[in-house]
Amino acid sequence: VLLKMKEIADAYLGKKVTDVVITVPAYFNDSQRQATKDAGVIAGLNVLRIINEPNAAAIAYGLDKKVEKEKNVLIFDLGGGTFDVSILAIEDGIFEVKSTAGDTHLGGEDF
């Protein structure tokens, strides 16, 4: 999957993609995260970081730029087949993960 995504990104950008950040479900354990990172290396990618999908959603939404003083934020990531939440402390553009959890048996398809 990562190799195919790399090929799509290379074609879309018109240049080789090497450095990547990969998102994973919040419930992934350390061995699943390492396997994802290893798959990235096999696909010829330099995996800079593995981050939880709820954290990626917070960054994409721009919370790092909208928060002026330290705030605790609860992020819901209601995917098609999973439900992830993270509690983040955000200050000066820095995200500190306080807690994260997920449920593989509850997601958007269940609603």
UniProtKB/Swiss-Prot annotation:
- Which is one Pfam family of this protein? HSP70
Keywords, A to Z, come to: ATP-binding, Nucleotide-binding, Stress response
Signal peptide positions on this chain: none
- A GO term, aspect molecular function: ATP binding
Entry keyword annotation includes Nucleotide-binding: yes
Check the record and name the InterPro entries matching this protein: ATPase_NBD, Heat_shock_70_CS, Hsp_70_fam
PANTHER family assigned to the protein according to its UniProt record, in alphabetical order? HEAT SHOCK PROTEIN 70KDA (PTHR19375)
Similarity remark? Belongs to the heat shock protein 70 family.
**Protein name as it appears in the record:** Heat shock 70 kDa protein
